[in-house]
Each structure stands twice: as C-alpha cells, then as structure tokens.
Amino acid sequence: MASSDLEAATALKVQGNKAFGQHEWPTAVDFYTQAIAKYDREPSFFSNRAQAHIKLEAYGFAIADATKALELDPAYTKAYWRRALANTAILNYKDALRDFKVVAKREPNNRDAKVKLADCEKLVRRMEFEKAIEVGDPPSAFEDLDIDAIAVDDSYDGVRLEKEMTQEFIDDMIERFKNGKKIHRKYAFQIVKAVKDIVYAEPTMVEIGVDQGTKLTVCGDTHGQFFDLLEIFRLNGYPSEKHAYLFNGDFVDRGSWSTEIALLLYAYKWLRPNGIFLNRGNHETDDMNKVYGFEGECKAKYNERMFKVFSESFSALPLATLIGNKYLVLHGGLFSDDNTSLDDIRKLDRHNQRQPGQQGLMMEMLWTDPQTEPGRGPSKRGVGLQFGPDVTKRFCEKNGLEAIIRSHEVRMEGYEVEHDGRCITVFSAPKYCDTTENKGAFINVGPELKLDFQVFEAVPHPDIKPMAYAQNSIMSMM
C-alpha cells in the first residue's frame, strides 16, 4: 500500500482517539474500522479498536482485534493487556492469566501489571476451588436462617416492617437509601424471602395484558444506578395500582447501589405482586455477581448470607414476559434454533437449572444480541450468538408477535428499533458506569398496546464510583 494510505489511516486513528477521549465509543470504533480499511497492517489500529470494543462490552470482538494486533506484531504488549482484560470480563480467567504473565514479564517495573496478575491468579484459584467443592443440589440459602429471631435494636430509626410490606415502609426505605443509610438486615432478609417465594411460583414466561385505565412501563438495565431509577419514577410516576412496571433484568452489578435497587424493586413486588414484573438478566447470575460487584456489595453492606439468598431469588426469576400476545420481553434475545417457540419457553423448567451455563435456551435468552446481517453469527461478547433480521422476522411470524423487546446493550439514545421494527432494545442506565455518554429510556404501554418511548438523562449521585465493591482490581479497568 502507498504511504498515503498509511497517512490517511493514521489521521482516521487520531479521530478515533479523539472520539474515545470523549467517551463516544461507537464513533471511535467507526473511525478505527475506517483506518483498518485504509491500511490493515498497523497493530495499533486493531489494539485501539479492541479497547473501544471493551468499553462497549463487545469482548469477543476485542479479543479478536487484540489477537490480530499480535499477529501483526508479537511484541505489541498493549494488545496482550487488552486481550487479558476482555477475557477477564467474560470469565475466561486462565486465558487472561497467560496474557497478564506476558505483560508482567515484559514490563517488570509495571506495578499495575503485577497487581492485575496477582488478582487474576486469585480468580483462577477461586474458580478451581469452587468447582472442587461444588455440589449438585445445594441446600437452600434460607435453610437454618431464622429471620424471626433476628432482633432490631431500639436505636433503629426507620419504619418497622411487620409481616407484610407497606407503602410507608417503601417510602421510608427510599429516603434512607437516598441518604446513604441501609435498612436493617432482618428486613432485607424478609423482603428477599417473600419475593423469592412469589417469583418461584410464577411461570417461566409471565403473560400479562394492559387493562383499560392503566399503563405498563418497560425498563431495561438499571445496573445499580439507584438515583437514575428514582429519576424514572420522578418523571414517569411511581408504581401504583394503575401503573405497573416491568424491569427487564440487570438490576445489579457495575453500579454501586445494586442492593438498593434490588431491595426497592423486590419491596414493590412484595407489595403488588401483579403490578411489578421482574425478568432475569445475565447479571442476575452467580458468575457475574462475583466479578462485577454485587457479591462484594452485599458483603460490605449486609453479609455473605445476604448474597446467597439474593442468588437463590435470582435463580427463581422468570425469564420472559409476554405483553398482550404481541410483545415478547426478554433480556438478551433470540435463539440458535428456528424451531424454538413461545411454547418452548413456557415449558422450560428454570428451577432445574439455577445458573444459565454456556449453552441452551436459558443462556440464549439472557445473552444473545441482534446483528444487522441476516442469519446468525458469533457473539461480539464471546458468549452466546448474534441473530439477524431474518431470524427475528421468522420468530415473530411463527409466534404471532409484533416485536421482541430486549435490553442487554447500551444504546446511545436509550433505545433503538431494529430489524424492520421487530427488535427493540431499551436500556435504562444513562451515562452508564459514569463513562458512556448515553441517554436512558423506558417504554410506556397503554391498553391499545402502542409503544411510547421516553428518553431521559442521568442525574447526579454521591461520589461513589461504579464497581466500588468489585473484589478485584481488574474490573476497574473496564
């Protein structure tokens, strides 16, 4: 290629770097991709695009780009670093460890590399230990937990919770959380136990309508961004007898108020079981919670048992909600097999499989993503797969649906309508992780089943960083 191609490509890389510095990750990816199209022999173009993919949680793409950079220049240490980060994000700790070792060996004075290497070694040891002691059917986390015997001191300055949830308790809980206070662990245990029992009895696919004089609001990922959740309620109304909410998974992890969101949504679910609906997301799972902050947050704010009971409640959550026989709402997306139908979801016994694993219907419902190309493709995340507009069309036509509504991915405008209107993504965590300049969105659905998209901006929150409770330093790099 002519030197002019390299010069033009380098100029595009500079524009990509500028967009990256402004937290405009999709724009950065576009510029790096244009640079590669001009000149595909420069490893930094691929390595920089890998870093932008990491910010977009496209970890599979990041691994592929970092690997390409190393094919072009095996001495390009930065690519090992980025591939290690991406592998850590999708829990491929052993692959990450190999790359962290390379970085630490090549840069012996790099203190950060030594810390990340040590953290990754701990993750590998923990994974191997947990696998060694794993039992097929563990006892309930509520076994031997005598909630009634837990005493609440007279000094507790909040509203007391008796045997049933009240609006008064919820109102007080919201104010406590806003002011950096907790509720008593007894009340937290009560809430989780009550909701675990409620959702366990619900079908794997909950089927609901929207009655005259009422509305339903569908929210996407909230990821521990408690103050942005309150902004949704401020703008759109709090849950009530006439106003139901459906939260489409990923209530927890990343944001540092995950226990607050989970307890608030659970409290509303207990108060109005038919007015709050909760789908499971890929972050309502043990593997993700142990890496992305929720386990550490439970331990820091309550205790280890609190995480275990939450984990058990997460495994009981429904996987999908069908609205008016027109919209299938699920966290990730569609399936590897065109023959999969709504009846297959109905028949899925989620209670026999507490965690989604690496394959199968539950994993696909929690992890897959849409793509613009027809057919199916490998996952940009490195987990699951991607499905094209033809896949969505066939599924909707076969099952009599107007569209699927999913979450699972940042959208810069808060939502996106794709696949000829048949695939809708809604994401409700604006300024995601305090680094992405995205808006949040939610969808209001009335009795006529028309979709009304609402967009909102992030609001200020106390100075606690995302991932503050993650139990290793690696994830702070994401």
From Swiss-Prot:
Its main location: nucleus. Binds 2 Mg(2+) or Mn(2+) cations per subunit. It catalyses: O-phospho-L-seryl-[protein] + H2O = L-seryl-[protein] + phosphate; O-phospho-L-threonyl-[protein] + H2O = L-threonyl-[protein] + phosphate. It is an enzyme of class 3 (hydrolase). CDD domains: MPP_PP5_C (cd07417). The active site is at residue 283. It comes from the Eukaryota. InterPro entries: Calcineurin-like_PHP_ApaH, Metallo-depent_PP-like, PP5_C, PPP_dom, PPP_phosphatase, Ser/Thr-sp_prot-phosphatase, TPR-like_helical_dom_sf, TPR_rpt. TPR repeats lie at residues 9-42, 43-76, 78-110. Mn(2+) 2 binds at residues 250, 282, 331, 408. Its cofactor is Mg(2+); Mn(2+). One of its GO terms (molecular function) is phosphatase activity. GO terms for cellular component: nucleus. Keywords: Hydrolase, Manganese, Metal-binding, Nucleus, Protein phosphatase, Repeat, TPR repeat. Mn(2+) 1 binds at residues 221, 223, 250. PANTHER family: SERINE/THREONINE-PROTEIN PHOSPHATASE 5-RELATED, SERINE_THREONINE-PROTEIN PHOSPHATASE 5. Protein phosphatase that specifically binds to and dephosphorylates the molecular chaperone Hsp90. Dephosphorylation positively regulates the Hsp90 chaperone machinery. The TPR repeats mediate protein-protein interactions with substrate proteins, but also autoinhibit PPT phosphatase activity. This is Serine/threonine-protein phosphatase T. It comes from Aspergillus oryzae (strain ATCC 42149 / RIB 40). The lineage of its organism: Eukaryota, Fungi, Dikarya, Ascomycota, Pezizomycotina.
